[in-house]
Swiss-Prot record:
Gene Ontology CC terms: extracellular region
Extent of the signal sequence: 1-20
Cellular localization per UniProt: Secreted
Domain notes: The presence of a 'disulfide through disulfide knot' structurally defines this protein as a knottin.
Propeptide: 21-34
Pfam families registered for this protein in UniProt: Toxin_7 (PF05980)
Protein name listed in UniProt: U2-agatoxin-Ao1o
Modification Leucine amide, positions: 68
UniProt organism field: Agelena orientalis
Amino acid sequence: MKAIISLLLISAMVFSMFEAVPVRRRFTAFEGERGCLPHNRFCNALSGPRCCTGLKCKELSIWDSRCLG
């Protein structure tokens, strides 16, 4: 009985170590989608002059401030 309890405790400790590692992976299929922030509909400032349409970052026309494509 003690062996079973010890085995359960050890497996719980091992599982908790694996559980502590964050598993956040974002999938960006295209280069143009990188930097799009859907919560405020703007692209990341580091991605250049771009804007969000839907969930995709598109090029921003400098002359008339609208999305191209």
